[in-house]
Amino acid sequence: MKLLLSGMLAGYILASSILSMTTGTPRMPAISRETLHLVGYSSKMKIPNVVCINSRYLSSEGGWVKRSVNYMFPIDKPWRGKSSTVEVKWEPYAVLLHMKTSYDVSRDLQTKSQYVVRNYDDNSLVLSDLNEVSSCSLWVTKEYLDKIPETTNRTFYHLCPDPVYTPFDENCYVN
């Protein structure tokens, strides 16, 4: 009987160690080295004449991550692009994502200084306005532009009123 119990215990320990190796804590995309693409938002957040919004990792220092925010104005051909630096900070498991932006980014993209993290995994992120829960944005890595993770997609669709998905435009990747 002791041999059977010790065999079961050994099997449990082995299974637990394998599970813990494969199901760790997800990486927060906003502070990772991945490029993030805005693929959805609440319809009331639509910004006329701004498309192709993405954010690339630049560096980190003192708990803040520097990212470039890139976006296009599709008014004339060729499209005019703009790039600015923002800083983001997120404490592990925290509800809030903090952001420092330039005046231009704040004006062009109507950014806030804090966002509520509604859902995230290694490749996707749903944020909402701290004061206006109905204002949400959905960000994914390039690998997930065509296949948004189900839990993230469900969170975006159910928590964000009148969700809008941004259409893929090849002009975003010409430059």
UniProtKB/Swiss-Prot annotation:
<feature type="disulfide bond">
    <location>
        <begin position="136"/>
        <end position="160"/>
    </location>
</feature>
<protein>
    <recommendedName>
        <fullName>Japanin-like-RA2</fullName>
    </recommendedName>
</protein>
<keyword id="KW-0732">Signal</keyword>
<keyword id="KW-0325">Glycoprotein</keyword>
<feature type="glycosylation site" description="N-linked (GlcNAc...) asparagine">
    <location>
        <position position="153"/>
    </location>
</feature>
<feature type="signal peptide">
    <location>
        <begin position="1"/>
        <end position="24"/>
    </location>
</feature>
<comment type="similarity">
    <text>Belongs to the calycin superfamily. Lipocalin family.</text>
</comment>
<comment type="function">
    <text>Salivary tick protein that modulates host immune response. This protein blocks dendritic cell (DC) differentiation from monocytes. In addition, it inhibits up-regulation of costimulatory molecules and pro-inflammatory cytokines in response to stimuli and promotes up-regulation of co-inhibitory molecules and the anti-inflammatory cytokine interleukin-10. It has a pocket to accomodate cholesterol, which may have immune-modulatory roles, either directly or through interactions with the host gut microbiota.</text>
</comment>
<dbReference type="InterPro" id="IPR012674">
    <property type="entry name" value="Calycin"/>
</dbReference>
<keyword id="KW-0964">Secreted</keyword>
<keyword id="KW-1015">Disulfide bond</keyword>
<feature type="disulfide bond">
    <location>
        <begin position="52"/>
        <end position="172"/>
    </location>
</feature>
<comment type="subunit">
    <text>Homodimer; non-disulfide-linked. Each monomer accommodates one molecule of cholesterol in a pocket.</text>
</comment>
<dbReference type="GO" id="GO:0005576">
    <property type="term" value="C:extracellular region"/>
</dbReference>
